[in-house]
């Protein structure tokens, strides 16, 4: 069994501290939370990706999973009008691009809460 450190709990510290702890405590990999300030997909330009890959190499701690922030505001794949859903799909595509550029083998997606919409409407999406 392998264990990964999910970096969401480090959102109020430097991302490097997550890599330091993962290495110090014997974790096998990083699950990188894709939220601000560390790795929000729209912020992930080539320079930011390079910084994170450098931390991964420095601490011998691979980024195997990228988990974009999508469990609440501003993205919910299950609610909103067509324009909001299309925006969510663009964000999802960008998140998967970021995951690939980071060298992660997985992107963890949570579809969010369907609210109280009609079941047929949810299935149609």
Which residue stretches match the model-derived regions?
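N-terminal amphipathic alpha-helix/helix-capping segment at the start of soluble metabolic enzymes
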Residues: 1-4, 56
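Hydrophobic faces of well-ordered beta-strands that scaffold small-molecule active sites
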Residues: 3-8, 30-32, 61-68, 107-109
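Short beta->alpha connector loops
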Residues: 9-13, 36
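Acidic (Asp/Glu)-rich catalytic clusters
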Residues: 19-25, 44-67, 93-103
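Glycine-rich, proline-tolerant flexible connector loops at the mouths of alpha/beta enzymes
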Residues: 31-57, 111-118
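Active-site acidic/histidine proton-transfer and metal-coordination neighborhood
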Residues: 57-59, 74-125
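Flexible loop/hinge segments that line or gate small-molecule binding clefts
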Residues: 71
């Amino acid at each position: 069994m392998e264990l990964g450190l999910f970096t969401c709990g480090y959102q109020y510290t430097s991302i490097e501290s997550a890599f330091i702890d993962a290495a110090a405590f014997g974790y096998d990999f990083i699950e990188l939370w894709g939220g601000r300030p560390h790795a929000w997909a729209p912020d992930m330009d080539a320079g930011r990706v390079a910084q994170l890959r450098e931390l991964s190499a420095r601490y011998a701690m691979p980024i195997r999973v990228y988990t974009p922030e999508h469990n609440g505001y501003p993205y919910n794949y299950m609610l909103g009008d067509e324009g909001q859903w299309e925006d969510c799909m663009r964000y999802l595509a960008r998140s998967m691009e970021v995951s690939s550029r980071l060298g992660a083998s997985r992107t963890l997606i949570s579809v969010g809460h369907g609210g109280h919409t009609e079941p047929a409407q949810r299935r149609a999406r």
